[in-house]
From Swiss-Prot:
Lineage: Viruses, Varidnaviria, Bamfordvirae, Nucleocytoviricota, Pokkesviricetes
Compartments where found: Host membrane; Virion
GO cellular component term, pick one: host cell membrane
Keywords in alphabetical order: Host membrane, Late protein, Membrane, Transmembrane, Transmembrane helix, Virion
Protein name: Uncharacterized protein CP123L
Organism: African swine fever virus (isolate Warthog/Namibia/Wart80/1980)
Similarity section: Belongs to the asfivirus CP123L family.
Biased composition (Pro residues): 35-47
Induction: Expressed in the late phase of the viral replicative cycle.
Length: 123
């Protein structure tokens, strides 16, 4: 096994050679551009997402004309049902609710209300 002094000298020589090689490439690039490969350009950002347009979607679908004509009316009716469900939930009697939904996994009445509101936000 070589001594520590020998290892230090070998390491210093390798380090000096690496530095010299670096300067050689820098000088060669300055004299003759194109010797080194060009740097990799940064990735281009993705194009902005187009906002969802329900009317445009309905035009592209192959649904029957009757469905296309009435889809907005049906969507409004569904929205009305959901909003009335929320209002009904807010006015619901706590004891009646807990009596009807015993064993459904609701810890409290407020827990059930919060779960229902989360469900409505998702859909």
């Amino acid at each position: 096994m070589p001594s520590t002094g020998t290892l230090v000298i070998i390491f210093a020589i390798v380090l000096i050679l690496c530095i010299m090689l670096l300067f050689f490439y820098k000088a060669a690039e300055a004299r003759n551009p194109g010797v080194l490969p060009p740097p990799i350009p940064p990735p281009t950002p993705p194009p902005p997402k187009k906002k969802y347009d329900h009317n445009e979607y309905m035009e592209k679908t192959d649904l029957e004309p009757e469905v296309k004509k009435n889809h907005r009316k049906w969507a409004n009716e569904a929205e009305h049902l959901i909003s009335s469900s929320v209002k009904g939930l807010e006015n619901l009697d706590e004891t009646a609710f807990l009596a009807n939904h015993k064993g459904h996994g609701f810890r409290t009445f407020d827990h059930a209300k919060s779960l229902f509101k989360e469900f409505l936000k998702k859909y």
